[in-house]
Amino acid sequence: MEFKTNDQSLGQIRIYILPDDIGRGVVARTRNSLRKDMRKLLTEIDIANSTWVGEWDEGSPVAHLDASLDKKEEDQASLFYLFNTLPSPSPIPELVENNVARNAMYGLLDSAVAGLNTIMHQYQRRSAALMLQRESQPSQTVDPRLTAVIDKKGVAWYCDFDAATCLREPRQYENSTGGILAETMGLGKTLICLALILATKEISSQIPVEFSVGTIPVRERTGSLKDMAAAAVGRTGAPWKSYFATLEEEGYDYFRCKEAIKKYPGHYFIPGPVPRRQSRNPIPKQARKVFLTTATLVVVPSNLVKQWELEIKKHTTGLKVLVMTKSKQILPKAEDLAEYDLILFSKQRFDMEATDGLDKMGRSKSTTFNVCNCPYIGATRERDCTCFKVEDTYRSPLKQLHFKRLITDEGHSFGNSSRTARTEATTVIDFLQVSARWIVSGTPTKGLYGAEVALGSSRSTSSTPLPSNEADDNGQLLGKVTNSLAALKRWDSYPADVNQQEMAFYKEERKDLEKLGNIAAIYLKAKPWSNSLEDGDYASWSQYVLQPRHGSKSHGNMDCLRSTLEGMIIRHRPEDVERDVILPPLYQSVVNLEGSLQDKLSL
């Protein structure tokens, strides 16, 4: 700290901050009172160069360390605007280290995918390729809670204003191997997903790093070269089917090799849960054996199952598909499920897998007693026992497989879930082992949709075609759509009820952000938002992402919100789509429908 006086009444203090990641072994930083003082200090510091050198007066503007404090509220972009100005997908195959995945990306970008009957548009190729890139080579990103600041020497350091933490080197997280495919309705999201599944048809899921210890077997005696090679193929998930198929076309016979590979499927073990209470004679929980597979799970609403079946038949050839829609339809065994390329579930049938660990009466081991109090049969000493029995519980075959990916069509309903409000679907998702998770929805939340949709909606009373030049420039398009939102911030041009209009808009925007947070934490398991209190690095979505306009306890900044959205969502801007395909004129007209008796009664 340095102190300097300008005159008898004014002075300045130069403050030097010791980053939290320096001197951790000798400097204690556990006192909450000091952390609270640091938080207050960080909001008051003026980092302007003129202030640093002493060239300031009482009228000089303050340049806060937290730049968001210097921005006017009307300068803050809305969530709708951010969603519609996200950068269009730009996949880079060269960043993918895995040769098989990189070649699959090139195949997607060229629309040269084996088994794909349809030639994709350029924007569809880019979206599918970026999905594969995120699955195969998730990038490292700076913790979105941190803000980069440049010190007086021109060196960057990082600050978490809410936690009052300063770091010389930033914390980094691996981006989620999934996200939200949010292309506008009608742009072929189903085709994009099918192309991704076909392009990675032979790419298996991989053993998670945290469970990889001990996966290399120790044999009692040296195995044959064939068996050891087959075990290595299964353990590493190396693609082998097309390789042998090509050689067999030349007249070679690899039947014994293929049988050996099937004999040694890749697998790993998940340790049993740690008991909550210590006991003198603890009973160790048995580890769960999980097998690797190339299968993709697809969960869709019941009314879209037929559409997916038709799209699969129309666009693909050679996919081995299992459709699960009926409540009484029993799932095949795990080893049989692993042979499918695509397992299509209706949402209702998928939710039924939440009964794992329950008997037919909905009881589990943790909710029942071990003492039988059932009545006797007549005058005999034999009980009419209906007690819970572990052998009578349902065991979902899905728990025995590590799937390559999970795709949920119209999965925005997961935004209604939370850490405390659980549903059957979230229960199933929690016990599933999946390498990548995707939600497919053009409207991830109620207020998030394409600007072109909003413009079309505003013209719904007109039967004239949409002029093509109105959609040529995305900035003009967004300007037309968001004009009313921007006007709400011009307090002098609206009557007194503008406060109510703006508050209603912010309330709906807060709901949209909360739903996105639930999707990120509950479904996508995106770091750091999925961290729990037990992890010691809990990140509150409401604190870091929600903006001050959304509540008194929200201190999020726009950079954090923007980086979070860019890491989650894949969608094209309207002008980038129109460069690839010229759509016919859009005609809209209002058609009045006579309501049925049920419609009238519901009113």
Give each language-model segment a name.
Residues 1-126, 227-232, 238-267, 273, ...:
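Charged, low-complexity intrinsically disordered regions
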Residues 17-19, 101-112, 172-179, 287-292, ...:
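Surface-exposed beta-strand-to-loop junctions
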Residues 101-182, 191-265:
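Conserved pre-motif I regulatory segment
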Residues 123-129, 338-340, 355, 438, ...:
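Inter-lobe connector of SF1/SF2 helicase motors
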Residues 185:
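The conserved Walker
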Residues 188, 413-417, 446-447:
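Catalytic P-loop NTPase motifs of RecA-like helicase/translocase cores
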Residues 204-408, 412-421, 493, 545-549:
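SF2 helicase/translocase NTPase motor core
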Residues 405, 426-570:
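Conserved P-loop NTPase motor "coupling/switch" region that bridges the ATPase
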